[in-house]
Amino acid sequence: MDKELKKEKIKLILIEPEEHLGYLLSEFFYQQNFVTYISESFIHLTDIINLHNPDIIIIDDSQNLETYKLSNIYLPIILLTTRGLKNDRMKIHKLGFDAYMLKPFDPDELIAIISNLIYKKRNIKELQFIKHRISNLNLKLKYRETSFSYINLTVKEKEVFKFIQDGLTNKQISNVMGITQRSVEKYVTKIFEKLKIQNRIQILSYFN
């Protein structure tokens, strides 16, 4: 097994209808430093996932392929099967399995596949986390930029800005501030130029 995986406990769900095979497989996975949760059927898989938060799922039940609904399971899933014909392989992929192994399988190959799928899953999570961080950073930079531009407004311009956000017209602002409507229009023009906006609607959502 990969050195990094050996350092940690990998949590695995095993769907195995036959009790003695489940025991043998769980013993094998235990030797590989895996924590194995065994279920005899697919029915309660969602509950098991929510309870144990596993890293990967292995299903040894090729007799009931059509019963598996995998579209809502965002975990790597491996099928152990005796079905090796082309049509069977196509069906396996269409159902959403990430990988499959023909029985009897090579234990080392199975561990290699598990290791590879787990790393892919983690890399995807890391990429999603990075994208989320970048998105948040862009929002912060945008807010800082808008805040900096707002700071450059004069006292009078900030007053007009606030009144526009409150929904007042130019005429209403001129009455409140005791200045001409023409003066208000000049302030509005300056605000548009400094904040690089084009209309009053953009002022209403400026800090959002």
Swiss-Prot record:
Q: Which keywords does UniProt give here? A: Chloroplast, DNA-binding, Phosphoprotein, Plastid, Transcription, Transcription regulation, Two-component regulatory system
Name the GO terms of the biological process aspect. phosphorelay signal transduction system; regulation of DNA-templated transcription
Q: Which residues form the Response regulatory domain?
A: 11-118
Q: What does UniProt give as GO cellular component?
A: chloroplast
List residues of the HTH luxR-type domain. Answer: 146-208
Q: Point out residues bearing the modification 4-aspartylphosphate.
A: D60
Instruction: Please report the organism this UniProt entry assigns to the protein.
Output: Guillardia theta (Cryptophyte)
Query: Could you tell me which Pfam families the record lists for this protein?
Result: GerE (PF00196)
Protein known as: Probable transcriptional regulator ycf29
Recorded GO MF terms: DNA binding
